[in-house]
């Protein structure tokens, strides 16, 4: 399940940047944007399944940290969607980019620090 979640995130980020480049070039990015929305569903479902598998075995404060990671992941998805919607309507996106980047850094840090991660920050 971890590999499916990571693959969904990688595809989601690729589709996000493709849709962003299409919108910023003035072309229609609706098809890519809709594909990205399907990836959001896969990301959320696989993330929730991972969270539920951890709840069964985690002890101590691990529930809290994985819950924080899940909330930050939802913020990343919300930030991605808000950036693309504002780009499609030709509105400023500075604050939304800030939300997206802060949430993405938090998710990456927690994902690499927590036990299911790669132990980069040990």
Swiss-Prot record:
Family listed: Belongs to the UPF0344 family.
Protein name, as recorded: UPF0344 protein BcerKBAB4_1054
Cleaved signal peptide residues: none
Localization per Swiss-Prot or TrEMBL: Cell membrane
Keywords: Cell membrane, Membrane, Transmembrane, Transmembrane helix
Residues that span the membrane, as ranges: 6-26, 38-58, 65-85, 92-112
GO cellular component, one term: plasma membrane
Originating species: Bacillus mycoides (strain KBAB4)
Pfam families (alphabetical): DUF1516
Topological type in the membrane: Multi-pass membrane protein
InterPro entries assigned: UPF0344
Keyword set includes Transmembrane: yes
NCBIfam families, alphabetized: PRK13673.1-1 (NF010194)
Membrane found in the keyword field: yes
């Amino acid at each position: 399940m971890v590999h499916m979640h990571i693959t969904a995130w990688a595809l989601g980020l690729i589709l996000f940047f493709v849709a962003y480049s299409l919108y910023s070039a003035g072309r229609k990015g609706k098809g890519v944007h809709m594909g990205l929305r399907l990836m959001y569903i896969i990301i959320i479902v696989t993330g929730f399944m991972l969270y539920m598998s951890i709840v069964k075995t985690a002890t101590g404060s691990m529930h809290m940290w994985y819950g924080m990671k899940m909330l930050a992941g939802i913020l990343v998805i919300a930030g991605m969607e808000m950036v693309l919607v504002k780009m499609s309507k030709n509105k400023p996106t500075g604050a939304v980019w800030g939300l997206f980047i802060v949430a993405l850094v938090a998710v990456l840090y927690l994902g690499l620090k927590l036990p299911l991660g790669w132990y980069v920050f040990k």
